[in-house]
Amino acid sequence: MGNHCTRIPCCKKVCSCICCCNRRNKTQARSQKGSYFIKGKVHPVSRMEKWEEKITEANSHGKILVVNFKASWCLPSKTILPIYQELASTYTSMIFVTIDVEELAEFSHEWNVDATPTVVFLKDGRQMDKLVGGDAAELQKKTAAAANLLLRQS
């Protein structure tokens, strides 16, 4: 692809390279770890009970659950967060959650999350789409497509 990964902490072109935010590079990026909090329509999931609550809510109301697997030390995860927040405010017919891959490491592994951010779209508990990497335009496109699917089913 022509992009060169600097690995400290991320690529020169954040949106198209996901190699830098895999788990093996987290140690290098830790020194630049900043805190960022989720507010508003995005629900942080740090316990399996909260996951069960959100997936049950989505399934019982016929909503799409959008799951952002992130890492606090990952620059693309931080970069995409405001866009994810904006999408959650725009598409209120969907439920948006974030999962820190270190807080729920085993669960993230079960969902085959090898790089962050990874965004998974679920309908009726089943994966309908997935985005790996911090491509904001692609995230917006996939979210709009999921919303259109909900409209057509209404």
From Swiss-Prot:
Domain (Thioredoxin): residue spans on this chain: 23-148
GO MF terms, alphabetically ordered: protein disulfide isomerase activity
Pfam families (alphabetical): Thioredoxin
Subcellular location: Cytoplasm
UniProt keywords, alphabetically: Cytoplasm, Isomerase, Phosphoprotein
Modified positions (Phosphoserine) in chain numbering: 31
An annotated GO cellular component: cytosol
The keyword Secreted is annotated on this UniProt entry: no
Source organism, top-level taxon: Eukaryota
Role according to the record: Possesses low disulfide reductase activity, but efficient protein disulfide isomerase activity. Does not possess deglutathionylation activity.
Name under which the protein is recorded: Thioredoxin-like protein CXXS2
Species whose genome carries this gene: Arabidopsis thaliana (Mouse-ear cress)
